[in-house]
Each structure stands twice: as C-alpha cells, then as structure tokens.
UniProtKB/Swiss-Prot annotation:
It comes from Xenopus laevis (African clawed frog). Interconverts simultaneously and stereospecifically pyruvate and lactate with concomitant interconversion of NADH and NAD(+). Gene3D superfamilies: Lactate dehydrogenase/glycoside hydrolase, family 4, C-terminal (3.90.110.10), NAD(P)-binding Rossmann-like Domain (3.40.50.720). This is L-lactate dehydrogenase B chain. The lineage of its organism: Eukaryota, Metazoa, Chordata, Craniata, Vertebrata. Pathway: Fermentation; pyruvate fermentation to lactate; (S)-lactate from pyruvate: step 1/1. GO terms for molecular function: L-lactate dehydrogenase activity. InterPro entries: L-lactate/malate_DH (IPR001557), L-lactate_DH (IPR011304), L-lactate_DH_AS (IPR018177), Lactate/malate_DH_C (IPR022383), Lactate/malate_DH_N (IPR001236), Lactate_DH/Glyco_Ohase_4_C (IPR015955), NAD(P)-bd_dom_sf (IPR036291).
Length: 334
C-alpha cells in the first residue's frame, strides 16, 4: 500500500538530497556556542548546521528548539549529536567548548585543563573534516589557537582564532559614542592578545580618512586632556563588566564569529583582526598566536596586512607576545 508521501511526490532523481557545500559545525552548546549558531542561522551562512557537545540532554533540547524554528530560517538541515561523525564534511568548525575558570585558579592551570579538553575535540574534528577551517573561540583564545594548530596538524591558514575581532568592534563602538558617528565609519584596530595586554593602535584610528592623531597628537596617551585612553581601558574591562551584570558574554561574540564565518563562506577577502601565528613579525621570535589585520577568504586566512605601527605600539605588541609565551612554554602534552 502506498504511503502519503509516495502518493504526493513523484521522484525524478534518486539522490534527492544534495550534499551540503557550506556545512558549519559548532562545538559546544553553551551560551557562546548557541549565540554563534543563531548568528550563523540568521545570516544564512550554512546549508547544514551541526552541533556537538558532551551534554546530551542540553544538546537535544537546543537542536529541537532550533528545528522548531525551521519555518523562519533558510538552513535546510540542523543536526546534533555527541558523536563527532555528525560533523563530517564540515567546511568550517567553530570551537567554543572548554572548561570555565574556577575561583582563584591560575591562568596556566586553566589553559592546561583546556588543553586536555582540546586533545579530545581537535583530533575528532580533523578525523571527520580533514579539509575544514577551524575557528577557535574558547578562552584564552590565542593560546588555544596555538594548541589547536599543534594538535590538528593543519596548515596555519586554516587555523584562526576569533582574537580581537570583538575587541576592535567594542573599540569602534566606544569611539562612535564619543564622536556621534556610526561605528562602521569609525576605523581602528585592537591588536595583540584578546585580553589584558591588547594593543590599541591609536596611530591608525580615523574617520573618513582623517587621523584622530593628526588632530590631537597626544590622543590615547596619559597627556591627553580628553582622556581617550579610557576608551581602550573600557574595551579591556567590558567583558568583565558584562559578566558581572549578566553572568556571561555571548551575543557580541556570536555576531563577531558569524562575520568571520561570512568572510570565509562568501570568499569576501575582508580584513579582520584575528589570531594567527606571528613569529617573524614585528620582532617577535616565539611561536605565539596574536591578532593582526588578516585577509579572510574562501581559503581561510590568506595574508596579513603589514600595518605601520609606531615604536611604542610595536613594544606593546612584543609585550603581549611575551605574556602569552610565558604561559605557552610551560604547557604539557602537546
């Protein structure tokens, strides 16, 4: 007896489902992972979205919730599983998984615990998607991007840390608030570590090509009567402030990651401040990953823009590298 489906549909092609060409996987379905997932869905960047996590009930609930909204989305397939086979043939894998920092825990201890988590995650990702591009979001992101590069065996251009893409967005937002100009018209970069030693490149801050330093040479320094230096301090402190108020950060990093994904999936060649290997640049001679302005397209991170930095900015970048190397050099089991 024929089923309703058989009576309704006459098949013309035996292979009804085409293989996805822009499959995106999110590893970790916590607040950040789900913000990344929703941002990717709303920007219509994937023809298949896969979620993976060790928390089975949480994972099942999140994927059901997204699937129930399928009518309002243009991503035909949303899947989830604890088993990494669900991630097979991903074009991009976004890693948000890891362990949270405990009260009083040293940064090195936190990193080492996350190394142990990544030793499980990364080989599984590469096993099922050997040609993928990996975007690392878990913190401390620069060190864990280095860890991912070491564990994956993938070339540098396919390992990207979300880095200071969000820090730079915060920077531009705060500049826009001071000037009354939209953030998209306020240009400036935060480089280096995604964290306390990040570098505000005041020499490059401009609106419509007009350098703010040309108008006020002391901008961003202690001698600045307008206290623009406070803008960078707010960038550094902003995550702590949001966490204090709501317990975590998720939406802005989700939007930031989706923009990085978009530059890759749409082969845009846009410049993003993201974390990459910087050995040999700006006098840095250690294997650290830091954020520099990078070109992202369909092949991944294809080039770095050689930004003209002032001597004090180069010094700050080198200090950022030293801070990360101080932790990185003591990591075990890589």
């Amino acid at each position: 007896m024929s089923t309703v489906q058989e009576k309704l549909i006459t098949n013309v092609c035996q292979d009804k489902a085409a293989k996805p060409t822009n499959k995106i996987t999110i590893v970790g379905v916590g607040q950040v992972g789900m913000a990344c997932a929703v941002s990717v869905l709303l920007k219509e960047l994937a023809d298949e979205l896969a979620l993976v996590d060790i928390l089975e009930d949480k994972l099942k609930g999140e994927v059901m919730d997204l699937q129930h909204g399928s009518l309002f989305l243009k991503t035909p397939t949303i899947v989830a599983d604890k088993d990494y086979s669900v991630t097979a043939n991903s074009r991009i894998v976004v890693v948000t998984g890891g362990v949270p920092q405990q009260e009083g825990e040293s940064r090195l201890n936190l990193v080492q615990r996350n190394v142990n988590v990544f030793k499980f995650i990364i080989p599984q990702v590469v096993k099922y998607s050997p040609d993928c591009i990996i975007i690392v979001v878990s913190n401390p992101v620069d060190i864990l991007t280095y860890v991912t590069w070491k564990l994956s065996g993938l070339p540098q251009h396919r390992i990207i840390g979300s880095g200071t893409n969000l820090d730079s967005a915060r920077f531009r937002h705060l500049i826009s608030e001071k000037l009354g100009v939209h953030p998209s018209s306020c240009h400036g970069f935060i480089l280096g570590e995604h964290g306390d030693t990040s570098v505000a490149v005041w020499s490059g801050v401009n609106v419509a090509g007009v350098s703010l330093q040309s108008l006020k040479p002391e901008i961003g320094t202690d001698q600045d009567s307008c206290n623009w230096k406070e803008v960078h301090k707010k960038v550094v402190d902003s995550a702590y402030e949001v966490i204090k108020l709501k317990g975590y950060t998720n939406w802005a990093i989700g939007f930031s990651v989706a923009e990085i994904v978009e530059s890759i999936t749409k082969n845009l060649g846009r410049v993003h401040p993201v974390s990459t290997m910087v050995k040999g640049m700006y006098g840095i001679e250690t294997e650290v990953f830091l954020s520099l302005p990078c070109v992202l397209n369909g092949n991944g991170l294809t080039s770095v823009i050689n930004q003209k930095l002032k001597d004090d900015e180069v010094g700050q970048l080198q200090k950022s590298a030293e801070t990360l190397w101080g932790i990185q050099k003591d990591l075990k089991d890589l």
